[in-house]
């Protein structure tokens, strides 16, 4: 009885995926450097995302109560992702209280 060693070293092709977006871009570690806690980041980003969302809704009506995105939005990008990119870029100041 003979045993043959077969090597599994074949040229495996690696799957190519789009990089994840949203909370992973910008990285959470970079965002946490901008605020005092992860809870402050959540509140800060949520408030700004609501402002951006309201801006889009009011722009259709011709009312401009809120300021629109301070970064160039990507096609189909959600308000929360825009807000996180603004925070990471240092374009916003916030007060905790």
Swiss-Prot record:
Family: Belongs to the RNA polymerase subunit omega family.
GO cellular component terms attached to this protein's record: DNA-directed RNA polymerase complex
Free-text function comment from the UniProt entry: Promotes RNA polymerase assembly. Latches the N- and C-terminal regions of the beta' subunit thereby facilitating its interaction with the beta and alpha subunits.
Cited SMART domains: RNA_pol_Rpb6 (SM01409)
Protein name: DNA-directed RNA polymerase subunit omega
InterPro entries: DNA-dir_RNA_pol_omega, Pol_omega/Rpo6/RPB6, RPB6/omega-like_sf
Natural source organism: Corynebacterium glutamicum (strain ATCC 13032 / DSM 20300 / JCM 1318 / BCRC 11384 / CCUG 27702 / LMG 3730 / NBRC 12168 / NCIMB 10025 / NRRL B-2784 / 534)
NCBIfam families: rpoZ
Alphabetic keyword roster: DNA-directed RNA polymerase, Nucleotidyltransferase, Transcription, Transferase
EC number: 2.7.7.6
GO molecular function, one term: DNA binding
Lineage: Bacteria, Bacillati, Actinomycetota, Actinomycetes, Mycobacteriales
Gene3D superfamilies on file: 3.90.940.10
Catalytic activity: RNA(n) + a ribonucleoside 5'-triphosphate = RNA(n+1) + diphosphate
Annotated GO biological process: DNA-templated transcription
Gene that produces this protein: rpoZ
Subunit structure, as described in the record: The RNAP catalytic core consists of 2 alpha, 1 beta, 1 beta' and 1 omega subunit. When a sigma factor is associated with the core the holoenzyme is formed, which can initiate transcription.
């Amino acid at each position: 009885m003979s045993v043959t060693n077969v090597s599994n070293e074949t040229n495996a092709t690696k799957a190519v995926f789009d990089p994840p977006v949203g909370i992973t871009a910008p990285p959470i570690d970079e965002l946490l450097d901008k605020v005092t806690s992860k809870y402050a980041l959540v509140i800060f980003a949520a408030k700004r995302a609501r402002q951006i969302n309201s801006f889009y809704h009011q722009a259709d009506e011709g009312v401009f109560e809120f300021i629109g995105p301070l970064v160039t939005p990507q096609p189909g990008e959600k308000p929360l992702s825009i807000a996180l990119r603004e925070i990471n870029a240092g374009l916003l100041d916030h007060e905790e209280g």
